[in-house]
């Protein structure tokens, strides 16, 4: 009974999907809906698999610092892997979930420097947290403050003075006297002066337009003038005027008008006060977060002062009473029976008895976590095409802690690695490529990428390094191995060392004499080999009446034999390949063209035309151009004398038909 009773403040497991791990949440409120169901307002806690890899590395560095400072005992790699499943990240994100999705209780504690990490592995359903995750900003912050110890943060305590020894320090620089208790005024005179100061403050608010809007009544103005800011200013005025009441009175009411003193309660507008109440409802008394997210234009001191003044108002008292009444009306606890429905991921073997799970388990397939071959129940785990499964104990571990007991390749790490990554960070193709059950052919398909055209633009220092550090760079060898890495930092350092010495002997540049394109084209045309003539024998006479002979068969059979010989009975598809047997091309549309594999697509070729090539085009007739396009592998014979710019052919003048007065008739 007590195990199924859940109260406000409990850490519980929530199940949002049958194939995903449980969600760890803290119950903040239990509300009853109009339908009679119970909803739980919970605080979200995140696992390592829920955050990015960069934040995981940040959490790893924080864990290493904690182990060094607290001098944790050494743990094995498997224990370190399981400790990452016990670490959670607190957040300030709230959500509402049905109470019927609760699957059990757990314990979450703040990591203390006196804790031993290995103790968390000995306890069931036990987690810890030390960092706070912000789902919006994607940041990790420490949840607790730090004690600054050292001479940099502590004050230096001077030695005690001997009796009769004077203090040679300048007291005016160290402190300022704001009130003298041995003043000549009596307590009655001081109280009368404070009453006058309140009256001056009330009169000043009546003259001020903005104050008259905020405090429309005399009672509200008098209450605002009676706050501590007015009394502190009056007492400071007495101290500065040597406790002379006449001088102090004239200071309160100068020539320009009475002095108006305002505190944070009057400086803040109504909208800013509403923002503060909303932030206080969300963050509590975390003034740094309130200032950062809601009131960035206010100083931290201003927010703290407003908070303690706001607690003295009637609005705070009313809200406190309303919250107490709501807390009394809300549910304090809820009873959720144990969830007994079977999980959809259970594997029911073919031929097994009803109610038995895993009876006919296939040989050769083991648990992905503990590699056992026998279990009372088996559960499908991972992508469906992988056919991975877990035993009953490993499935419960996966649901509670969001990982496997041992790091596997499907989780994103090789067995024995020190830092396995969560499988939740991998897509399905990546998980398949890392799985031991994926064939090499499938991996090759996954690694295939589309070819992209790129431009490599080098700097002057890189071009110098090619010549000065040729022995280290080995450009010819590197060109044959474009995927082998090159230590650019070492070559850059060596180039900077050799650069001062090489400046004395400048490099000799041998310019290449490049012939014009027209000359190269003429040489290619002259050197083009002649097309070899194929030997042609005597033509075999064809007996045209041979096909029409009967040869002992009927007319219909002769026609079919002729169609078979001529090839008319073999239909061809749109891409030139014969259709498969059983497909009729006459009654069905043409077959779909085959698509090229992106990895087999040819590289783009760009042909830049010049004046000479354009002249060659003009020297050819339209028929020769089409013949050359059909046979691009054969050389093209062009007479050099024909390479000349032909005079432009005058266009014939358009002939306009003579206008007639006869009507134009359009026939359908």
UniProtKB/Swiss-Prot annotation:
Keywords: Acetylation, DNA-binding, Isopeptide bond, Metal-binding, Nucleus, Phosphoprotein, Ubl conjugation, Zinc, Zinc-finger. The modification Phosphothreonine is found at residue 534. Widely expressed. The modification Phosphoserine is found at residues 52, 54, 433, 435, 548. GO terms for molecular function: chromatin binding; histone deacetylase activity; histone deacetylase binding; RNA polymerase II-specific DNA-binding transcription factor binding; sequence-specific DNA binding; transcription coactivator activity; transcription corepressor activity; zinc ion binding. Residues 263-315 form the SANT domain. Residues 145-256 form the ELM2 domain. It comes from the Eukaryota. A zinc finger (GATA-type) spans 367-394. InterPro entries: BAH_dom (IPR001025), BAH_sf (IPR043151), ELM2_dom (IPR000949), Homeodomain-like_sf (IPR009057), MIER/MTA (IPR040138), MTA1_R1 (IPR035170), SANT/Myb (IPR001005), SANT_dom (IPR017884). There is a cross-link at residues 492, 508, 559, 595 (Glycyl lysine isopeptide (Lys-Gly) (interchain with G-Cter in SUMO2)). The modification N6-acetyllysine is found at residues 152, 460, 522, 531. Component of the nucleosome remodeling and deacetylase (NuRD) repressor complex, composed of core proteins MTA1, MTA2, MTA3, RBBP4, RBBP7, HDAC1, HDAC2, MBD2, MBD3, and peripherally associated proteins CDK2AP1, CDK2AP2, GATAD2A, GATAD2B, CHD3, CHD4 and CHD5. The exact stoichiometry of the NuRD complex is unknown, and some subunits such as MBD2 and MBD3, GATAD2A and GATAD2B, and CHD3, CHD4 and CHD5 define mutually exclusive NuRD complexes. Interacts with CHD3. Interacts with CHD4. Interacts with GATAD2A. Interacts with HDAC7. Interacts with MBD3. Interacts with p53/TP53. Interacts with MINT. PANTHER family: METASTASIS-ASSOCIATED PROTEIN AND MESODERM INDUCTION EARLY RESPONSE PROTEIN (PTHR10865), METASTASIS-ASSOCIATED PROTEIN MTA2 (PTHR10865:SF4). Belongs to the metastasis-associated protein family. May function as a transcriptional coregulator. Acts as a component of the histone deacetylase NuRD complex which participates in the remodeling of chromatin. This is Metastasis-associated protein MTA2. The gene is MTA2.
């Amino acid at each position: 009974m007590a195990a199924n009773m859940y109260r406000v403040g409990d850490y519980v497991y929530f199940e949002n999907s049958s194939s995903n791990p449980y969600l760890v949440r803290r119950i903040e409120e239990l509300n009853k809906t109009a339908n009679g169901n119970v909803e739980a307002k919970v605080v979200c806690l995140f696992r390592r698999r829920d955050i990015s890899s960069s934040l995981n590395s940040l959490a790893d560095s924080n864990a290493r610092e904690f182990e060094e400072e607290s001098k944790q005992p050494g743990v094995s790699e498997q224990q370190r892997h399981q400790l990452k499943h016990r670490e959670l990240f607190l957040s300030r994100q709230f959500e509402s979930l049905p109470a019927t999705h609760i699957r059990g209780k757990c314990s979450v504690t703040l990591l203390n420097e006196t804790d031993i990490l290995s103790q968390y592995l000995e306890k069931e359903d036990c987690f810890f947290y030390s960092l706070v995750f912000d789902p919006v900003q994607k940041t990790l912050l420490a949840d607790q403050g730090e004690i600054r110890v050292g001479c940099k943060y502590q004050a230096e305590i001077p030695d005690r003075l001997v009796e009769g020894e004077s203090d040679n320090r300048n007291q005016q620089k160290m402190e300022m006297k704001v009130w003298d208790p041995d003043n000549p005024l009596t307590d009655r005179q001081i109280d009368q002066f404070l009453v006058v100061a309140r009256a001056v403050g009330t009169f000043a608010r009546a003259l001020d337009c903005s104050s008259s809007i905020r405090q429309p009544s005399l009672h509200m103005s008098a209450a605002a003038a009676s706050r501590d800011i007015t009394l502190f200013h009056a007492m400071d005025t007495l101290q500065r005027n040597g406790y002379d009441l006449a001088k102090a009175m004239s200071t309160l009411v100068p020539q320009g008008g009475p002095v108006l003193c305002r505190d944070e309660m009057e400086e803040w507008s109504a909208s800013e006060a509403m923002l503060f109440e909303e932030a206080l409802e969300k963050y509590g008394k975390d003034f740094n977060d309130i200032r950062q997210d809601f009131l960035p234009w206010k100083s931290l001191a201003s927010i703290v002062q407003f908070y303690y003044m706001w607690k003295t108002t009637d609005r705070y008292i009313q809200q406190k009473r309303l919250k107490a009444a709501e807390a009394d009306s809300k549910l304090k606890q809820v009873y959720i029976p144990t969830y007994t429905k079977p999980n959809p991921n259970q594997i029911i073997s073919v031929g097994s008895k009803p109610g038995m799970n895993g009876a006919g388990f296939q040989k050769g397939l083991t648990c992905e976590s503990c590699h056992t071959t026998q279990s009372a129940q088996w559960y499908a785990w991972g992508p469906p095409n992988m056919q991975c499964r877990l035993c009953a104990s490993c499935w419960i571990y996966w649901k509670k802690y969001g990982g496997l007991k041992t790091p596997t390749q499907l989780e994103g790490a090789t067995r024995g690695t020190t830092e396995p990554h969560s499988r939740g960070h991998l897509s399905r193709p990546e998980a398949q490529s890392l799985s031991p059950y994926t064939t090499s052919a499938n991996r090759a398909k996954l690694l295939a990428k589309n070819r992209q055209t790129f431009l490599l633009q080098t700097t002057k220092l890189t071009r110098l390094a090619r010549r000065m550090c040729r022995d280290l760079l080995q450009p010819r060898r590197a060109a044959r191995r474009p995927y082998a890495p090159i230590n650019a930092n070492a070559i850059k350092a060596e180039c900077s060392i050799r650069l001062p010495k090489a400046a004395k002997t400048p490099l000799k540049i041998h310019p290449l004499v490049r012939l014009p394109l027209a000359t190269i084209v003429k040489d290619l045309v002259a050197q083009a080999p002649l097309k070899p003539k194929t030997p042609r024998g005597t033509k075999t006479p064809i007996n045209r009446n041979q096909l029409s002979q009967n040869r002992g068969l009927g007319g219909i059979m002769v026609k079919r034999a002729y169609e078979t010989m001529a090839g008319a009975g073999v239909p061809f598809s749109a891409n030139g390949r014969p259709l498969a047997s059983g497909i009729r091309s006459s009654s069905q549309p043409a077959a779909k063209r085959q698509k090229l594999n992106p990895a087999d697509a040819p590289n783009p070729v760009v042909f830049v035309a010049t004046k000479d090539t354009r002249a060659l085009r003009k020297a050819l007739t339209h028929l020769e151009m089409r013949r050359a396009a059909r046979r691009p592998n054969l050389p093209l014979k062009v007479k050099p004398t024909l390479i000349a710019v032909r005079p432009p052919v005058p266009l014939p003048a358009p002939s306009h038909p003579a206008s007639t007065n006869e009507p134009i008739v359009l026939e359908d």
